[in-house]
């Protein structure tokens, strides 16, 4: 049986860990609230942009753009969004597992895909499996700005426009609730299925519609990537908050068990001492 000193040291150590996980839970809750606000503030911009683009693409003018046209797929680009830090439950593992499975199931050679990875966890995951990472981005803020992701947006949209990749997919955790996130692997380019707006507003365009499409479609693709990153950040903070809450609860349970063990050990030690005293007194009679 462990000594009283050893048990007390374990209790003290677990209490220190509990303080850390509780603080991390509170920090993640604050970051989650801000991330949800950022996500909500970005949505009206994307809704209006989608409304205009769907009006043009679904109109009768026949306006087209290369970003709308499907072509034979020889190489697929994947934007994989993970975090720079762990301690977030299954947040990273779930999206990396699904992407890894798709790479193995749909491709026979590394020449058939390019990985654009956001987050240290994702970069380390693929490199440890000898899977080439074409471009990596790490060190993003917990509340990312569009300027921060502009480079990877430029790389991916540019690669599609130049014909270096024939389709582009977004892979990330989408926020469902604080305790639930859903992995999404969705096609970003070509933009073949822009959702039709529910608005019945009719627009008159100046200059011609194809010129407007040429200006707006890259912005729309960039917005989809940035929106996915905002959504993923909400999921990350929610997952970390839930994980730290669970860790704090587990620490409480462990402390209760250790205290019970400590009390039993102390009681056994006292009983042993009394027995020895009584035995010694009896021997003197």
UniProtKB/Swiss-Prot annotation:
Q: Which GO terms describe its biological process?
A: proton motive force-driven plasma membrane ATP synthesis
CDD domains per the UniProt record, alphabetical: F1-ATPase_gamma (cd12151)
Role noted for this protein: Produces ATP from ADP in the presence of a proton gradient across the membrane. The gamma chain is believed to be important in regulating ATPase activity and the flow of protons through the CF(0) complex.
* Protein's cellular compartments: Cell membrane
Q: Which GO terms describe its molecular function?
A: ATP binding; proton-transporting ATP synthase activity, rotational mechanism
Against InterPro entries, the record matches this protein to: ATP_synth_F1_ATPase_gsu, ATP_synth_F1_gsu, ATP_synth_F1_gsu_CS
Ordered alphabetically, the record's keywords are: ATP synthesis, Cell membrane, CF(1), Hydrogen ion transport, Ion transport, Membrane, Transport
Q: Does the keyword ATP-binding apply?
A: no
* Entry protein name: ATP synthase gamma chain
UniProt record similarity statement: Belongs to the ATPase gamma chain family.
Entry's HAMAP family? ATP_synth_gamma_bact
Q: How does it assemble?
A: F-type ATPases have 2 components, CF(1) - the catalytic core - and CF(0) - the membrane proton channel. CF(1) has five subunits: alpha(3), beta(3), gamma(1), delta(1), epsilon(1). CF(0) has three main subunits: a, b and c.
Tell me what gene encodes this.
atpG
Which membrane topology describes this protein?
A: Peripheral membrane protein
Q: Please give the Pfam families that the UniProt record associates with this protein.
A: ATP-synt (PF00231)
């Amino acid at each position: 049986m462990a000594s009283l000193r050893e048990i007390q040291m374990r209790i003290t150590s677990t209490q220190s860990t509990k303080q850390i996980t509780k603080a991390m839970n509170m920090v993640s809750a604050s970051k989650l609230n801000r991330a949800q606000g950022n996500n909500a503030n970005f949505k009206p911009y994307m809704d209006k942009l989608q409304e205009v683009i769907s009006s043009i693409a679904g109109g009768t003018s026949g306006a087209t753009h290369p970003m709308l046209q499907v072509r034979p797929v020889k190489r697929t680009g994947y934007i994989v969004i993970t975090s720079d830090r762990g301690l977030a439950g299954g947040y990273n593992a779930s999206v990396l597992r699904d992407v890894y499975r798709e790479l193995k199931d749909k491709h026979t050679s590394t020449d058939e895909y390019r990985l654009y990875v956001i987050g240290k966890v994702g970069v380390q995951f693929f490199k440890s499996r000898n899977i080439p990472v074409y471009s990596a981005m790490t060190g993003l803020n917990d509340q990312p700005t569009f300027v921060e992701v502009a480079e990877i947006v430029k790389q991916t949209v540019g690669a599609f426009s130049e014909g270096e990749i024939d389709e582009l997919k977004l892979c990330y955790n989408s926020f469902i609730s604080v305790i639930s996130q859903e992995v999404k692997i969705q096609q970003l380019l070509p933009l073949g299925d822009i959702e039709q707006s529910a608005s019945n507003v009719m627009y008159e365009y100046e200059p011609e519609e194809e010129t407007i499409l040429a200006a707006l479609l890259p912005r729309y693709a960039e917005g989809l990537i940035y929106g996915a990153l905002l959504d993923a950040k909400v999921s990350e903070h929610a997952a970390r908050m839930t994980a730290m809450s669970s860790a704090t609860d587990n620490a409480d349970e462990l402390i209760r068990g250790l205290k019970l063990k400590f009390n039993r050990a102390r009681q056994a030690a006292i009983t042993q001492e009394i027995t020895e005293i009584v035995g010694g007194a009896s021997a003197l009679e």
